[in-house]
Amino acid sequence: MGLFDLLKKKPASENVLADAQPEQNLQPVETQQKGAEPYLGDLEKTGAISELVKTPHSGRDAAWQKEFLQIVSQASFQCGDPQVISGPDGFPYFQLFLPEPNQQFQCYVIDRMKDDFLLNLGYAVVINPVGEQPDWVFTYGDIVNLHVNHIFYTNDETAFSKNRQDEVIQSKEKVLIGQPSEYILPLATRQVLRSFLQANGISVPKVVLMQRQDQIKSHISQDLVFNITPENFGNEEDYRAVMQHLAWFLPRHYAYAGMSENALPEFEPL
């Protein structure tokens, strides 16, 4: 197969498989290194979160969400018991709850947790998972974005492609192939992705960063491309499910695709 191969994009929406992560990931974690300073969150922001979550889910508009997201990473939380649960999507989530008034608690702060263990262990975060609906759910990819961009969600224009459908690279396009930097894929995230793909039958997961320029419109876009094709799976459904799962590991504005190794000799192991 030549370079002008079919770029198999993730589907826009699709059901995902259960048990997306190995169960051994659901273990208590040592959250702080010995001798390190304990987490100290911002109790004022904790109080603000406590007031915000009193608003029913139906009333949480854009202004509510903006305020919540601006302060939640610095607020103080306590962990659940167990610390980590398997979500309905099969992925591991570290449980955080608002502390009880006038009671001592071990403090957890998302901004500290992300670098101490969330990124390395492949954990997402769920806030107040009680009742029918938690107050907020952050995927692992949201935590990655907090690490690299200091915000959970990037809504500004980026170089990543907005196309989520399968594509064919046109002969008039300029294509540049390289490796994603640490800023795009941190080392810890590479390792987490590698473990996930190996658990799903990709023995040597590989990746490239593909930049494409449309000579007619002079538009430049980029995609992460993994060595994943339907031929790696027993059927198209399993392939599509794994491709959909990848979205959980990546910031939401990232675009990614699968392509045969025969089409891209520049692939390198994750």
Summary of predicted features, one role per range:
Residues G2-L270:
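An interfacial alpha-helical scaffold signature
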